Amino acid sequence: MSFILALLGAGAVEGSIKWWSRGHRAHHRWTDTEKDPYSAHRGLFFSHLGWMLFKRPSWKIGHADVDDLNNNKLVQWQHKNYLALIFLMGVVFPTAVAGLGWGDWRGGYFYAAILRLVFVHHATFCVNSLAHWLGEGPFDDRHSPRDHFITAFMTLGEGYHNFHHQFPQDYRNAIRFYQYDPTKWVIATCAFFGFASHLKTFPENEVRKGQLQMIEKRVLEKKTKLQWGTPIADLPVMSFEDYRHACKNDNKKWILLEGVVYDVAEFMSEHPGGEKYLKMGIGKDMTAAFNGGMYDHSNAARNLLSLMRVAVIEFGGEVEAQKKNPSVPVYGDDHANAA
């Protein structure tokens, strides 16, 4: 199987196993840097084709370890005989298949050899260019690799490139059954029939962890575009007595909910339940009433309240021991009458 793949790989005329793997490993190790042999940061044209047209000195390309390839006899054989193999497998073989098969030597040369190579080459080049430009980074966005089904279609399954860069040892590009990745299907089929083994996959827990972290990051980015009011930790602290005094003597339209003081002056006329319910709560602790005692308010109501924060109450609310005159209730006439 390895020998067949070495021959077919030579037929793609994209470099020997050793040469191609060396560049690919350098690309992964030095992604988006000056040492990346086809860095996307040098432009779409450069990453697609320019890196071959404008040859850079080898010392400018980042180092990549290929000792395992140097010790592989099949890889060394293919590398040594590469020029002969590309002529045999890239031109002679496809032309002969069409010529001997149905007598179309000219069509075999033009379509099966030349036109095929043009298509295969640009499909491969799109992995270095389009896959670093189009789509999103569902696993990480620190570097340019992206996932997109259009790129997957154009590259025969190599379009889920963000996953590939995050989990390079995984034999898959696409992890969902509905995602287009014929290379994965071929490898899995070979493994099923015993032609491939030791297929590596990254733990599902870690894959999902990366996805969740990116979802959280994007949610936080969206949250920064919204108004959330003054954070509770940044609010001034006041005593319950001062809160009540401000409402009674300074005509403040404040209510207390769960230890936080809210200014409802501008909202009173807009209150869906009517203005009178807010008026009766001014200067009081309305936590129980807000949370179902009078009406169980919605999440939207709580979000709206976040824009009305004024202060937090020391100790969270009225504390008997903190009253200036503990024998006199400060909760209102109803409490006084009850006393």
What are these regions (language model features)?
Residues 1-125, 170-254, 290-339:
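Non-catalytic, topology-defining segments of multipass membrane proteins
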Residues 2-7, 139-152:
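Membrane-cytosol interface motif
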Residues 18-34, 127-141, 152-171:
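Histidine-centered catalytic micro-motifs
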Residues 36, 267-286:
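Short, surface-exposed glycine/acidic/tryptophan-bearing loops
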Residues 73-82, 133-146:
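Interhelical loop and helix-boundary elements at the membrane-water interface
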Residues 149, 157-159, 274, 286:
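A short pocket-lining beta-strand/turn micro-motif at the edge of beta-sheets
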Residues 164-171, 278-289:
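Short helix/strand-capping connector loops at secondary-structure junctions
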Residues 240, 253-254, 260, 264-270, ...:
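Non-catalytic interaction/regulatory modules that flank or connect domains
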